[in-house]
Amino acid sequence: MAETTEFELVSPERLLFSEPVEMVVVPGTDGDFGAMPRHAPLLSTVRPGVISTYNGGKVQRRIFVAGGFAEVTEDRCTVLADEAFDLASLSEEAVRARLQAADDRLKEATSEAEKAEAAQAKAIAEALLAARKG
């Protein structure tokens, strides 16, 4: 049996899941990185993108995160995600509705802060749609 590391995904509301994995690939701000058992300690910011977990040499789960932070130790990888979506259970219609809502907010925004927030929401929705298709 292959050696595993514990992967935890945490949202602001709750622990989304915790499971043993052979490897997890995280979209770090400076590039994707893989965490495996006995990994050197690492802290990283996480950009919007897809986290992939591996077991048996195959992708087990793909989760889109909207950003956050990751901590890797020799026996654990914890991602604190701003938002997280399991791509296997997310419909394209739901993603398109999210993108449309973000686009509408951007068109209606009046202050610079509203525009920046709406633009970020739209960029995340576009990345989520691309991840859902890919």
UniProtKB/Swiss-Prot annotation:
CDD domains: F1-ATPase_delta. The keyword Ion transport applies. It comes from the Bacteria. Its main location: membrane. It holds the Pfam family ATP-synt_DE_N. Keywords: ATP synthesis, Cell inner membrane, Cell membrane, CF(1), Hydrogen ion transport, Ion transport, Membrane, Transport. GO terms for molecular function: ATP binding; proton-transporting ATP synthase activity, rotational mechanism. Transmembrane segments: none annotated. The keyword DNA-binding does not apply. InterPro entries: ATP_synth_F1_dsu/esu, ATP_synth_F1_dsu/esu_N, ATPsynth_dsu/esu_N. It is found in: Cell inner membrane. It is a peripheral membrane protein. Belongs to the ATPase epsilon chain family. HAMAP family: ATP_synth_epsil_bac (MF_00530). PANTHER family: ATP SYNTHASE DELTA/EPSILON CHAIN, ATP SYNTHASE EPSILON CHAIN, CHLOROPLASTIC. Produces ATP from ADP in the presence of a proton gradient across the membrane. F-type ATPases have 2 components, CF(1) - the catalytic core - and CF(0) - the membrane proton channel. CF(1) has five subunits: alpha(3), beta(3), gamma(1), delta(1), epsilon(1). CF(0) has three main subunits: a, b and c. This is ATP synthase epsilon chain.
